């Protein structure tokens, strides 16, 4: 017994709504390290023109002065803010199910009134939609995670991501509409760190990057890196400073593996996506060799209100026997303090 066209369309939309309600897009898989961090701090904003804005305090203009008795003092007019503007962008992902594919799964669809589907057809349709909805969610996560890492030049309609916000060339170009030549609008960057046992510069450069972040915006609370950097840092620390204490005559247990790598008490997170970015884009400084120090208070995801992963049900077009289901998102990645972050890389 067949489903009607309307029943298929409504069932697909309802199942997608239900799936995302119980598996929201912000419960991102652990391997999407950067997207997961951004989603934890997301701040919906009202839509307006083409930009999401952030207030940037770039100076205090202090007017402190000493005086005695009836000496005259002065007052000043303070203008301490600039506005960073990030163009919001629109993302789409979706899937199509043709009548032929439904038929291959034992599901018949007609233009009739419907309401006559068998239990077997209902079960088959449910299984098919569950699979499609799951891979739609996972695919959207994969896409958003990658795009939010890149600098925005990969597509004219892409938002600026981490590579543009925390840049290896921090004084070049503009970020958020503000000139990166301003010293107060530059992240810390260092390349060519070495990991040779006892003589490597990696620990010194990490300390310098840490102090630069603390000086300008507070203690970094999120650190992520690629495989090469993680291995280099871990091996440098173990081979340069590692010891094994053993009392003679007693038995010991030796177990391999690294439970956690940290710096100043902050876990150093491995980002598996860095390898994919190297394969796809082959940047001059490999992602696998990079490490980012991030102050999460100063960078976040900013979806437009009412536009954060909206399920869509476009109508079936007259010359295609196909049903369409999709997701859309509109927003930007926003940063209000560049000098609170750092990027470093090994040679």
Residue ranges and their predicted role:
Residues 1-289, 294-347:
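Flexible, glycine/threonine- and acidic-rich loop/arm segments that mediate assembly and lattice contacts
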């Amino acid at each position: 017994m067949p489903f009607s066209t309307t029943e298929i369309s409504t069932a697909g939309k309802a199942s997608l709504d239900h799936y995302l309600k119980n598996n929201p897009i912000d419960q991102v898989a652990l391997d999407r390290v950067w997207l997961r961090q951004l989603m934890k701090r997301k701040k919906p904003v009202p839509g307006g023109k083409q930009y999401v804005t952030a207030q940037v305090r770039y100076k205090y203009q202090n007017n402190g002065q000493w005086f005695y008795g009836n000496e005259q003092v002065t007052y000043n007019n303070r203008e301490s803010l600039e506005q960073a503007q990030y163009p919001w962008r629109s993302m789409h992902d979706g899937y199509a199910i043709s009548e032929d594919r439904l038929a291959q799964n034992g599901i018949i669809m007609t233009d009739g009134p419907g309401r006559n589907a068998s239990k077997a057809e209902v079960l088959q349709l449910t299984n098919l939609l569950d699979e499609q909805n799951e891979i739609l969610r996972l695919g959207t996560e994969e896409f958003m995670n990658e795009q939010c890492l890149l600098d925005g030049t990969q597509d004219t309609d892409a938002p600026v991501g981490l590579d543009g916000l925390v840049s290896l060339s921090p004084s070049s170009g503009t970020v958020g509409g503000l000139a990166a030549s301003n010293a107060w609008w530059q992240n810390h960057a260092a390349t060519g760190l070495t990991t040779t046992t006892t003589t490597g510069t990696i620990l010194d450069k990490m300390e310098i990057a840490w102090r630069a972040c603390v000086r300008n915006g507070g203690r970094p609370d999120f650190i992520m890196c690629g495989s090469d950097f993680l291995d280099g840092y871990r091996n440098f620390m173990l081979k340069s400073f590692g010891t094994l204490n053993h009392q003679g005559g007693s038995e010991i247990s030796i177990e391999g593996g690294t439970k956690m790598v940290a710096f100043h008490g902050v876990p150093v997170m491995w980002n598996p996506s860095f390898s994919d970015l190297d394969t796809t884009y082959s940047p001059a400084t490999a992602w696998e060799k990079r490490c980012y120090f991030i102050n999460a208070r100063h960078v976040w995801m900013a979806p437009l209100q009412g536009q954060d992963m909206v399920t869509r049900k476009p109508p079936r077009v007259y010359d295609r026997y196909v049903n369409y289901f999709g997701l859309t998102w509109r927003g930007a990645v926003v940063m209000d303090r560049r000098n609170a972050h750092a990027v470093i890389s090994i040679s």
